Amino acid sequence: MAIEKSADHSTVETVHADSADVAADPRAKSALVSDNVFEHQQTVRQVIFGHPVLIWWSFFFSVSAIGWGFDAQVNGAVLSIPSFRRDFGEQYDGGFVVPAPWLSAFNSISSVGQFFGGFLCSTIADRVGRRLALAVGVAITCGGIFGELFSTARAAFLISKLILGVGLGFYLTIGPLYSSEASYVQYHDLRIMSLTRSQQVSPVVLRGITTAGVNLGIVIGQLLSNAAIRGFGERGDKWAYRGPFAIQFFFVAFLAIGLPFSIESPWYLVRRNKIDEARTALQRLYGADTNIETKLVAIQMTVAQDLAAKESKWSDAVRGTNRVRTLISCGVFVCQHLVGIIFVLGFSSYFFQLAGLPTERSFDLGVGVTACGVVGTIISWTIVNRLGRRIIFNSGMAILSTINLLIGILDVVPTRGASWTQAALTVVWAFFYQVSIGAVAFVLLGETSSPSLRAKTTAVATATQAVFGIVMNIVLPYMVNPDEGNMQGKVGFVFGGLGVIATVLCYLYIPDLKGRTFEEIDLMFDIRVPPRKMGGYVIEH
């Protein structure tokens, strides 16, 4: 590795050695420090306008998250379409309902497919690259969508949802992973998997904003889904539900057309020891004005550290102080389910109809719920670094639990216009959810997890979220379906009560790590500072 001083911010290295050799070179460590200092000095404006190619390809791969959000929302929203209930349901009390067992299966099978699709994707991505792995995911997703469109029996529709879920598992893994790897320290994007790398090296001032943005792609997909339901749902034929399914082909086509022109992840190329190809990829992503060699050294250094970190065991995540860190990382996503995320966002339109609102109005309110979610997500970017993580998350839990209880009370003590009031409270719930725990959960995951165990902790958090999602999707149909529990608004008592318990635990365990470096966070956990006191703890340097 030849090294010489540049006239700008850092040292220039011409890299030819493999990652292990670079990691052992003290000059490489100096280059890494120099590059890190420069990154911390950059502003958001400089990042966005200085690297348009990088921003574009990060956005391109992140379209997969919008596709995931669309499917996640359409799963529950399609139940509000009368023709879907007619074709896949049974007659009940003068109408049609999908039996609760099948309803549970339809809603949960996609999560099962995503669980296995994620593991399959990671294996393929490490062997053949991120671009080809996403291409495989696009092909599988395409097959699942075709199955949804032309299924006429419940079993066939269920299998199609499973296949589609596997493809979406690829989306959940590759899209965010590519975005975080390609941008590496400057721009990070959607979904939990991206936190493994982007949180570890992102500037402190941007860390909260970038990870809070994890919700944006998802809620945009949810908004588009409800808009499609609104546009097609009142048709009397099969295209009332086939139309929203067919719109998913847009995301498939967008990715399929752009993939041949996309740039392979430089992180993958370095891991495969394809240094020259990695250099070319970095040059295309960052442009001629960026010190590419320094970034290449930084990637090689991190890859070498990752290889050393493989010696850690899964059991380390629940040992010593890591136990609390892992519980917090997973607990923030459990809280989302305990306050009713699946019920409010997944079953909102169906719930509105069960509450007695006209079909057309239920579709309008479904769009309103997700539109408020988009606004809430954007607002969260402006407050996450001003108010801090703890106050936003805990206040959100308290507000959401209260709203759930109010929805339940309105069902027990019916008043004139109670149905509309419940619907309005649901819209308000969606707004406060996205402003608070919807966005901040991803920030807390990246900040509280131990750097040496971040990949493992992230995997555990992802699995925990998936398991709770499957459970809720199985249980909820039995709670709300007219031929089963028919609880209607009384479901608010269930999630309100669970939310109150979770809020108490959040008061004890949710930390505020705003503005803290990872070294400071490690120190506070190591000396066992109570999480609720970390925000005001003074560290003597």
Functional labels for PLM-detected ranges:
Residues I292-A304:
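Short, well-structured alpha-helical segments
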Residues A2-G287, A304-H541:
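Alpha-helical transmembrane bundle of multi-pass membrane proteins
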